[in-house]
Regions:
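Proline- and Ser/Thr-rich low-complexity, intrinsically disordered segments
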Residues: 1-184
Length: 184
């Protein structure tokens, strides 16, 4: 009797993808573990790479075919997800008025990227919104947990509020008018 052992099939047992850290970057990676089959395994990725693991990837879909010496195959597809673009939205801004010094404010919202966010204003503040501002230009440096960063500039203007002064410029010979139509 002759015993013929069938070779084990090629299997991809683990796929670990690391998404890109910042919008527009190419620092994603895919690590796989393949085994089985006969002889050495070869790797063919949809982006042309021929190694088991691939790196320096931008967002998108990547397909892999693993082939053994007998041309038996296993395949898998993995996605590197995009990261929303980091942005700053100005919600409201109040200019400084002459009625009260240092009463300007800037209220913003951070969007995109990967939170939590870090705020660094040119006046030393580290909060999302700032207040008690004098007329000046303020720069916000915003970064996310992956150290992706952007900056934006906001200007607080000085608004002169008219001051109403009431002066009585009429001379009534020391008397005030008592009734409409009277000539006192």
């Amino acid at each position: 009797s002759i015993l013929i052992n069938e070779p084990g099939s090629v299997t991809i047992s683990s796929v670990i993808s690391n998404n890109i850290s910042c919008a527009g970057s190419s620092d994603g990676s895919i690590d796989i573990s393949a085994s089985g089959g006969t002889g050495l395994l070869s790797y063919s990725w949809s982006n042309g790479e021929t190694t088991e693991d691939i790196s320096n990837l931008s967002f998108g879909e990547y397909s892999l075919i693993v082939t053994d010496a007998n041309n038996c195959i296993a395949n898998d597809t993995t996605t590197i997800n995009p990261v929303p673009i980091l942005s700053i939205t100005l919600d409201s801004k109040s200019d400084q008025t002459n009625c009260s010094p240092y009463n300007g404010s800037i209220n913003i919202t951070a969007n995109g990227g990967t939170g939590p966010y870090s705020y660094s204003w040119s006046n030393g503040e580290t909060t999302e919104d700032i207040m008690g501002l004098e007329a000046n230009t303020y720069i916000l440096y915003l970064s996310d947990i992956n150290n992706c960063s952007i900056q934006d500039t906001f200007t607080i203007n000085s608004i002169t509020v008219p001051i109403l002064v009431l002066l009585d410029t009429s001379n009534y010979n020391g008397y005030s008018i008592s009734c409409n139509g009277n000539s006192d």
